[in-house]
From Swiss-Prot:
The gene is Ecel1. The keyword Disulfide bond applies. The lineage of its organism: Eukaryota, Metazoa, Chordata, Craniata, Vertebrata. This is Endothelin-converting enzyme-like 1. The active site is at E613, D676 (proton donor). SUPFAM superfamilies: Metalloproteases ('zincins'), catalytic domain (SSF55486). It comes from Mus musculus (Mouse). Binds 1 zinc ion.
Length: 775
């Protein structure tokens, strides 16, 4: 779904040299020999006839031709030997001089692959450990990180590039936005000024919200004037803090040509509702740590009766958790069932304890009519929220809303607040050491000036040539999906036609949005003040301007070419309500993609990610949307029932995987597992198409593996990763992706071409007889 704006090989081909022999009926004059051939002392045609009888001239000519042919064969053999066996073989053969880009890239690729492998492990028993065992042995998780993997290493490279760009002087070419992002970055680094201010910036925000306990006893000053709607406006419309529910502007799922206001369940601080329910020892520990965190922040902000306040706010959040529905519940995954478009007048009747027209008028600076339509995505939840408002003391409601604002902004305060946040994160996820300040500030620059920073990034680190090559790779993989659709035996003709139409209409965005090349267009995204000495105020200015941009969209025409993430993002995504795939420049970097790598590695690396995102258009979530991005059931009942049966096979497969005594939830991870499996197949068959069109690739120097095997190794090495044990608990609980080990094993074991490439015996762990397959 689209979020509100305010809130992420080529070779030197063998050149055949055609040498022309002029030996013929006219004699041997002018014979041309390739360079390096020794030239004989042959006699001229005018020599003594007695030394060269007439009948032997043909023999001499024939002999010369044979000598020439033998010499030519010797040269060709030498060239091929250099190409295939010499140190430059991986780089395109003997024609590639020492130090040429292809040779260096191939050598780098070979070193990377071989260092990550553990050849002592049978790939047919545990392909992940075979492909990643060497990497796992050699790497530890940095103290300030929860995880570390091969993709994270690309992120480190991108971060270093961004830091260097931000460290440059503010002057020079570029628009105001580039100067602002550098000033913002410096303001974030200025901890001396941040420490000097201490809690003061947050205390001013709390005062703006009415202070603590304003909704208390009637004899308190201001108690009679307390208005929940005004405080909700402050929280949601000024500070962008979701409280009780969320208000966003997004594409209308049933009419993606227009924007609509969406109201949904929200307002919890912890990342998953079940953490509030303390159903196991780990969630009990996290809940206890959260209570300590609340008390610590409340004390830092001068609140009284800290334990009581913390307990009351926590109990209110627990009530919200009890009436919320998990994001992985069938009720949430079925978008059509959740979608409920109502008028403002109807909304007021459904949820009567809020003044909806007044609230939306204030946030959107509009005068909405009672007939204005909004989309309610959690009708039952919102009805229960209305009852919760009625039954909860005003003082507790007020403190909860103020707390939600505090949680959103406290990371931008002085060291005591940051230390409290780190202690909570340490208990939840296990990171021992806080992130270094420069990384924190780079993250904030990405969040608040993503496109401005992206303009700097793509100018120096992503070429138009790379963009064109990746676009061609995407088209090859799309072509394969079109073929696969035709070959499916479980999908009828009517559904195939709709699936092909969706593929044809799918938009593909690669690298960066074109407006980044125009400084004045980038400047319009950041028309707010930034000063080097006012970091907290810079944050507030950014939040308020982002809200303005978001609310203005409600009356604007939809631009389906807009991007959700900036180009430096180390990510890729598919948006079903736009039918749009996006591959930012940040992920199109070595080792996922390198134009000089063998194509087996590019298709196994970035190609499987492209196939993954493409398959999302046809998984259990994306498959609910049609070619225009509208929520519309385009399947026949017969085809859809076949799809569900095939999907259930994948659910059962992943339900059998466990990590740290936690069972992977096959239903939670279904969409990502379908995409992993489908993406692997599409990329593999696209690579086979490339080989048919360009010819087999040359062996990678000093590696004994075929390029089909290297394709699968590259895929697996995308997901070489280490996680802290505490973070695995949250991953299994909240992540829609299966743990990386099982992303690899689940995908390759269900693909017959993998077993064929590695000669895996039938019914070995990586080549079971019965396989799950959708696409």
């Amino acid at each position: 779904m689209e979020a509100p704006y305010s809130m992420t090989a080529h070779y030197d081909e063998f050149q055949e040299v055609k040498y022309v022999s002029r030996c013929g009926t006219g004699g041997a004059r002018g014979t041309s020999l390739p360079p390096g051939f020794p030239r004989g002392s042959g006699r001229s045609a005018s020599g003594s006839r007695s030394g060269l009888p007439r009948w032997n001239r043909r023999e001499v000519c024939l002999l010369s031709g044979l000598v020439f042919a033998a010499g030519l064969c010797a040269i060709l053999a030498a060239m091929l030997a250099l190409k295939y066996l010499g140190p430059g073989a991986a780089g395109g053969g003997g024609a590639c001089p020492e130090g040429c880009p292809e040779r260096k890239a191939f050598a780098r690729a070979a070193r990377f692959l071989s260092a990550n492998l553990d050849a002592s492990i049978d790939p047919c028993q545990d392909f992940y450990s075979f492909a990643c065992g060497g990497w796992l042995r050699r790497h530890a998780i940095p103290d300030d990180k929860l995880t570390y993997g091969t993709i994270a290493a690309i992120g480190e490279q991108n971060e270093e590039r961004l830091r260097r760009l931000l460290a440059r002087p503010t002057g020079g070419p570029g628009g105001a936005a580039q100067r602002k992002v550098r000033a913002f970055f410096r303001s974030c680094l200025d901890m001396r000024e941040i420490e000097r201010l201490g809690p003061r910036p947050m205390l001013e925000v709390i005062e703006d919200c009415g202070g603590w306990d304003l909704g208390g006893a009637a004899d308190r000053p201001g108690a009679a004037r307390w208005d929940l709607n005004r405080l909700l406006y402050k929280a949601q419309g000024v500070y962008s803090a979701a409280a009780l529910f969320s208000l966003t502007v997004s594409l209308d799922d049933r009419n993606s040509s227009r924007y609509v206001i969406r109201i949904d369940q929200d307002g919890l601080t912890l990342p998953e509702r079940t953490l509030y329910l303390a159903q196991d020892e780990e969630s009990e520990k996290i809940l206890a740590a959260y209570r300590v965190f609340m008390q610590r922040l409340l004390r830092l902000l001068g609140a009284d009766a800290v334990e009581q306040k913390a307990q009351e706010i926590l109990q209110l959040e627990q009530r919200l958790a009890n009436i919320s529905v998990s994001e992985y519940d069938d009720l949430r995954r079925d978008v059509s069932s959740a979608y409920n478009k109502v008028t403002l007048g109807q909304l007021q009747k459904i949820i009567p304890h809020l003044q909806w027209k007044w609230l939306l008028d204030q946030i959107f600076q509009e005068d909405f009519s009672e007939e204005e339509e909004v989309v309610l995505l959690a009708t039952d939840y919102m009805q229960q929220v209305s009852q919760l408002i009625r039954s909860t003391p005003r003082r507790i409601l007020h403190n909860y809303l103020v707390w939600r604002v505090v949680v959103v902004l406290s990371e931008h305060l002085s060291s005591p607040f940051r230390e409290a946040l780190h202690e909570l994160a340490k208990e939840m996820e296990g990171n021992d050491k806080p992130q270094e300040l420069a990384r924190v500030c780079l993250g904030q620059a990405n969040r608040h000036f993503g496109m401005a920073l992206g303009a700097l990034f793509v100018h120096e680190h992503f070429s138009a040539a790379s963009k064109a090559k990746v676009q061609q790779l995407v088209e090859d993989i799309k072509y394969i999906l079109g073929q696969r659709l035709e070959e499916l035996d479980w999908m009828d003709a009517q559904t195939k036609a709709a699936a092909r139409a969706k593929l044809q209409y799918m938009m593909v965005m690669v690298g960066y949005p074109d407006f980044l090349l125009k400084p004045e267009a980038v400047d319009k995204e950041y028309e707010f003040e930034v000063h080097e000495k006012t970091y907290f105020k810079n944050i507030l200015n950014s939040i308020r301007f982002s809200i303005q941009l978001s609310v203005k969209k409600i009356r604007q025409e939809v631009d389906k070419s807009s991007w959700l993430l900036p180009p430096q993002a180390l990510n890729a995504y598919y948006l079903p309500n736009k039918n749009q795939m996006v591959f930012p420049a940040g992920i199109l970097q070595p080792t996922l993609y390198d134009p000089d790598f063998p194509q087996s590695l590019n298709y196994g690396g970035i190609g499987t990610i492209i196939g993954h995102e493409l398959t999302h258009g046809y998984d259990d979530w994306g498959g609910q949307y049609d070619r225009s991005g509208n929520l519309l059931h385009w399947w026949t009942e017969t085809s859809y029932s076949h799809f569900l049966r095939k999907a259930e096979c994948i659910v059962r497969l992943y339900d059998n995987f466990t990590v740290y005594n936690q069972r992977v939830n096959g239903k939670h991870t279904l969409g990502e597992n379908i995409a992993d499996m489908g993406g692997l197949k599409l990329a593999y068959y696209a690579y086979q198409k490339w080989v048919r069109e360009h010819g087999p690739e040359h062996p990678l120097h000093r590696l004994k593996y075929t390029h089909n095997q290297l394709f699968f190794i590259a895929f697996a090495q995308n997901w070489c990763i280490k996680r802290r044990s505490q973070s695995i608990y949250l991953q299994v609980l909240t992540d829609k992706h299966a743990p990386e080990h099982y992303r690899v094993l689940g995908s390759v074991s269900q693909f017959e071409e993998f077993g064929r490439a590695f000669h895996c015996p039938k019914d070995s762990p990586m080549n079971p007889v019965h396989k799950c397959s959708v696409w």
